[in-house]
Amino acid sequence: MTTITQNKKYIISQSLTGVATIIAMIFLPILVHLVPFSGSIPLGAYLLPMFIAPLVAAFYLSPIGLVIASLVGPLLNHYLTGMPTQVMLPHIILELLFFSLMVSYVVRNKSGFVGMSALAFVLAKLIRTIVVGALTGVLSLDMFTPLAMGLKIALPGLLILTVIEIFLIRRSR
């Protein structure tokens, strides 16, 4: 097989995987929000559906493709469904970018370990909090209270991400 043919197949494969990732980033949150749930906090904050597709894609998609999907997915989701809200959109995008880059780095270096997605999520939220605080000039310890609450709420989603990553790590070996 010629190099040009291999490159074409790679580009097509990456494009299809990227599109599938973006579609999953739109439809997984929609499915989660269709589940009847009463509470002041959206079910997505508990289950983290927006982070499932990038985790899976990190095993199949190039880092640049994953970054593009992490930008486009939430934007399309917002414009099609209104979720995440305009206020939360930049925060979600930053978190997804940091999360995707960390998970992709670990997967690419063949150092995937159980708990990497949970750790990447925690670090992504922490980095996002610091970046937003630095950009707005409101960098204080008070910023970390909502972060801690958000992490507590996200525990079921972190468990879901960990179960998915265990499956993916076993499958990739």
Ranges and model annotations:
Residues M1-Q6, I169-R173:
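Short, charged juxtamembrane terminal tails flanking transmembrane helices
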Residues V56-S70, V107-F113:
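Membrane-helix interface "capping/anchor" motifs
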